[in-house]
């Protein structure tokens, strides 16, 4: 019997369509061979790790729980250990009577969010034991506390000195008002919910070491969240990390002033995904009255890099009193930008006083160079960070960085060597320093108008006349910048720059924050 032509054509079509089906679909009903999983670039979580001079277990006795540990924070922990050791001998903000007793003084330390207890173990094993009277470590999680107790045995810790608690962090600190000399707080996200209790549990002159990892909020991605958390409005700019530090310090300072206390920043740095602040907190009602001079607002151009920064208040001399606070009226002379004629927007308030203490950084560098601290894994990187910050202190009165690439884009110019750019700034009598954390950012005492003139001068010298306004829309802000007269004559001579590894690469892919620790319920 002959096959029906229509049926024959249909079979051919089905065969053709079947050949087009991907192999994965064909084998759905079969039992496919299990694929080999690609090896991960980051090691699986170990049960035990050694960091500094401490060895800790990350799991409890029955291995049903793994405590939170992030290797990316080892830089943070290394710097904190040597900072606390430096604080033991730092006498700058002490009264003469306290300076005499500093050599014999013993210090108490609290770490309210401990997880593994690693920081506490490192303080016990790496800091001079004769300088420590008490180390308090705490975690809410019962199984985390179980891990901490395992680690106490592992590191042969004297339990008379190191005390373990299982409490809510703020509750523990409120129970111990004015008890601690050093408060080390490293939370997931913002430290702001813990600030009030940290301030109150610290003694007069105590050292606070705080970490903030909520960078999207502090850097301007969610300004409405920044406002209700920190009381400040950010602006999304290339120098957002410095803005983040200044927003956090403003919020901390305004909180401390409720208790007639002021902050003295020692070191503020950012690395990878977080900012870390070290500051001393002191009782001083008179200094609290000077806080308005340390807070300020910024008007930033919506298009170019021009900005105006004004403090909340100014000193006004008075014969009857030492000084009177005269509040600024928060107005600016020109509503529009003097560089490109665009509108300016207001943001802040920020901390506009010092981010660092030069004496502290020099003492920290001195300690770091000693052989007793050579074992620190991040010794050389800490040294580079501190030297970079020390270099920036040449222009410590200049608030916020500039973005070198943005200046080039604003005048439709290809980026040229930063060494040549620095030479041009220096030739006009101004200073410039490169940021310690981003090679594209810099600080200078040259006003934005002068920087744009340098860019335009370079373009005129190195481009043809017809290319000066090429691809520039007459209605754009770039056109307004380029059409302004050049008032300076810079010399483009390259400056020899220091060659060292200031900007190291991450050691592994996905090097950064870990997921938020989840609450583990007992079955």
Listing of model-derived features with the role each one plays in the protein:
Residues 1-523:
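SAM-dependent transferase fold signal centered on methyltransferase-like domains
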């Amino acid at each position: 019997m002959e096959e029906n032509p229509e049926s024959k054509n249909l079979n051919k079509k089905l065969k053709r369509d079947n050949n087009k089906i991907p192999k994965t679909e064909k084998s759905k009903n079969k039992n496919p061979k299990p694929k080999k999983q690609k090896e991960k670039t980051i090691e699986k979580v170990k049960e035990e790790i050694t960091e500094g001079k401490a060895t800790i277990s990350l799991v409890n006795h029955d291995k049903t729980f793994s405590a939170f540990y992030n290797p990316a924070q080892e830089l943070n922990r290394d710097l904190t250990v040597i900072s606390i050791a430096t604080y033991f001998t730092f006498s700058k903000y002490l009264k003469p009577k306290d300076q005499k007793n500093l050599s014999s003084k013993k210090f108490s330390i609290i770490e309210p969010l401990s997880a593994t207890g690693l920081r506490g173990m490192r303080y016990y094993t790496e800091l001079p034991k004769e300088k420590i009277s008490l180390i308090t470590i705490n975690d809410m999680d019962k199984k985390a506390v179980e891990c901490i107790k395992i680690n106490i045995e592992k590191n042969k810790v004297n339990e008379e000195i190191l005390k373990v608690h299982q409490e809510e962090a703020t509750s523990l600190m409120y129970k111990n008002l004015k008890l601690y000399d050093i408060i080390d707080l490293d939370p997931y996200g913002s430290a702001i919910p813990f600030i009030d209790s940290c301030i109150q549990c610290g003694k007069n002159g105590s050292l606070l070491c705080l970490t903030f990892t909520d960078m999207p909020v502090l850097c301007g991605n969610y300004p409405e969240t920044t406002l209700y958390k920190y009381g400040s409005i950010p602006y999304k700019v290339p120098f957002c990390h410095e803005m983040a530090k200044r927003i956090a310090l403003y919020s901390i300072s305004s909180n401390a002033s409720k208790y007639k206390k002021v902050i003295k920043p020692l070191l503020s740095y950012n690395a990878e995904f977080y900012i870390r602040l070290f500051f001393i907190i002191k009782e001083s009602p008179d200094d609290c009255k000077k806080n308005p001079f340390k807070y300020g607002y910024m008007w930033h151009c919506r298009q170019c890099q021009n900005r105006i920064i004004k403090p909340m208040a100014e000193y006004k001399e008075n014969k009857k009193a030492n000084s009177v606070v005269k509040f600024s009226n928060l107005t600016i002379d020109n509503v529009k930008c003097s560089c490109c004629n665009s509108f300016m927007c207001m943001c802040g308030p920020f901390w506009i006083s010092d981010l660092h203490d030069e004496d502290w950084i020099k003492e920290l560098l001195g300690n770091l160079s000693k052989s007793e601290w050579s074992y620190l894994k991040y010794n050389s990187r800490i040294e580079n960070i501190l030297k970079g910050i020390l270099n920036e202190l040449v222009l410590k009165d200049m608030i916020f960085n500039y973005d070198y690439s943005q200046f080039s884009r604003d005048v439709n110019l290809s980026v040229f060597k930063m060494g040549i750019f620095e030479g041009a700034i220096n030739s006009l009598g101004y200073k410039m320093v490169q940021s310690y954390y981003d090679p594209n950012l810099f600080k200078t005492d040259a006003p934005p108008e002068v920087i744009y003139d340098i860019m335009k001068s370079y373009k005129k010298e190195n481009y043809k006349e017809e290319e000066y306004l090429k691809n520039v829309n007459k209605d754009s802000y770039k056109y307004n910048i380029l059409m302004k007269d050049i008032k300076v004559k810079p010399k483009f001579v390259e400056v020899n720059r220091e060659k060292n590894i200031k900007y190291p690469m991450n050691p592994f892919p996905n090097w950064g924050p870990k997921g938020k620790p989840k609450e583990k319920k007992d079955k």
